[in-house]
Amino acid sequence: MTMVNGFWRWLTADPRHGQITTLGLLLAYGAGGLGFDVSAAQCGVTVATALAVQWLGDGWRGAPRRSGAKSALISSLSLCLLLRTDDLAWAAAGAAIAVGSKFLIRVGGKHVFNPTNGALVALLLLTDAAWVSPGQWGAGAMAGFGFASAGLAVVHRSARSDVTLAFLAGYAALVLARAAWLGDPWAVPVHHLESGAFLLFAFFMISDPKTTPDSRAGRVLFALAVAAGAAWVHFRLFRPNGFLWALACASPFVPVLDRLLPALRYAWPAPIPSSLSLDWRSPMIRRSVVTLLTALALGPGLAPRAEAFCGFYVSRADTSLFNKASQVVLVRDGDRTVITMASDFRGSPREFAMVVPVPTAITREQIHVADAPIVAHLDAYTAPRLVEYYDGNPCAVPSPAAAMDAARAMGAMRQSVAEALKREKSLGVTIEARYTVGEYDILILSATQSSGLETWLRENGYRIPRGASEVLGSYIRQQMRFFVARVNLAEQARLGVATLRPIQVAYESPKFMLPLRLGMVNADGPQELFVYALTRKGRVESTNYRTVKLRTDVEIPAYVKDPAEFTKMYRAAFDRHVADEGGRAVFQEYAWDMAWCDPCAADPLSRDELRQLGVFWLDDAPAGPQPMARRPVAGPQDVFVTRLHVRYDAAHFPEDLVFHETGDRTNFQGRYVLRHAWTGPAACPQATAYYRQVAERHEREAQTLASLTGWSIDEIRARQGASPRPGPEPPDRAPRPVPPPVAWWRQLWKR
């Protein structure tokens, strides 16, 4: 009890103690519970750099060395939570900018920018190698932390809870008003307001008492301005991280508000009781600086390497494993997008119809019909895969080169015309354009009222589900058009096309999204969507739902090699992944440079295939097939592919999918590994230990498969059979001793 009382006294002695505690808990939860891509090395570099720069800044300013340690720790923990980068130098730069800006950018003795916010915005402007993942928290997971933080803000005399409350109220009012104007169900704004990024910003960034106006009236005005700016960035500019941009733009006006509405300036409790000393003689400071210098020196070694994968490719889990599976290829660079839509429609062509909201008007030249085999090739290339290894003779002495290859292998691991026009006008529907492209008749529609559009579509033979009017109305108020396609049977017969081909549309818009909601009206159960994003910079992720990597590089029993078993296993494993995430996640199944693969489930796409999919930035090098590359080729590659798998329904995905491109070029494959044991004779002492390890591995594989799929461990063990045993000795000779290894210098000069 004494320890609890002591901790409570420490927690309530200074508002910063509550922030440090909560940020530390959030970081532990994010890294351990949500699988954030933040390494211990990045956290160590960030914290050490922040403390070191604070120590230097205090000395330069002539302040007590220990005065700013807590603030520096808060800034560094916030950066660990929000900043994503694979380069430790940029992590250090972010911490240096955050803390250094407090000393360098000051007006009237007060630093202008929130340290963490300023550093994040600076890095987003300076490099593609750093990014922020606003969807990493998901929706709902942070609610408990939000309430806890609100309680801490009151109990710990933060004196800035008015900023948080004003921002929360202002932004929530704008989001709810927008939903009411669009006619969206309340699930849409609620999902938006449940975002962990939103709550984290409200409680830990905009509430910084050292960078907000001194007067209460000024703080409320400031918070409302940031809320309005964030809403503008999100809903008018269609850019992620609107909170960060809005706060950065509003911060320079804080000195103006302080001059117009003067009040007593906030000061931390004095004296500041601190166990964090920034005295150079302090062991903590010395350890921090040593950590920083060591991490920077070893950064390239700490960063993950692209190792070769030397297993044998066995099988893949392509889209044919799932019913109701649609495929979309998104080629994106800047605001330019080429979307390829491949439907799994299997009925009569005369029954086919497609209605897709599009963000802008579309001309004939922007529409194309693609070849289905190219999409199938992309699906095969990016599909989760099954690979296998064969153990070598445990009695053989591996050469140094073979040992190195084995280490690498273990490391690496998408009516009349006049009457018709009159009727369209009465329903508020305008046919902006009509085209015939390949085997499709295509209309580009705009509308002024959802009920009129719904009526027009039904009267013209399009089977629109009842209740679609509400969703159509939301898209109409967002000034979106409707891309409507049906099959021209005469053209299909003339072209000799038996299977409907994918439709491609090229357009330019800041909206990087996929409209899902219209397809969920009266949908018969969850639907599968595969998104293949082809980009220049790096991996694509969702900004409004959590993007979760498949569990990969796990060893499973060898009997799963049978294609039917692998199909069954992968379906069950994906079902389990979806359930574990509450049905609200987007799953990353593949992320890799298009120039190579290791192992390859299919050859990389040729330059000509990429151009046909819409990759418009390729240079003018000769087109045609490329040899399959199993190692990265020299120089940067221009096409990075991300495969995302979504199982969606209206209950779990109330909003359309919104994406952004990150600077992350880390290679990732959904990969399952089979290990075949050596079954030869146990002709040496090492074999006894080897077969003991095989028995243990045999059990681990069964446990892993049970964990992945939820299947009964007893049934898995029964299918798996007994652990491999040594084979019989050859009948004509006794076991021979293994000769000692030859000295390396004898091999060198052949003596």
Region locations from a protein language model:
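Internal active-site segments that recognize and position negatively charged phosphoryl groups
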Residues: 127-184
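Membrane-interface helix-loop-helix junctions at boundaries between adjacent transmembrane segments
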Residues: 64-138
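C-terminal ends of transmembrane helices
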Residues: 5-6, 52-64, 97-111, 149-159, ...
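A cross-kingdom signal targeting lumenal/periplasmic-facing segments of multi-pass membrane
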Residues: 362-437, 446, 621-626
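C-terminal transmembrane helix-loop-helix hairpin of multi-pass membrane proteins
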Residues: 4-22, 175-278
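Surface-exposed, glycine/proline- and aromatic-rich loop segments on solvent-exposed faces
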Residues: 331-394, 453-474, 479
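N-terminal signal-anchor module of multipass membrane proteins
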Residues: 1-58
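Accessory, solvent-exposed terminal regions and/or long lumenal/extracellular loops of proteins
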Residues: 307, 311-321, 408-412, 464-704, ...
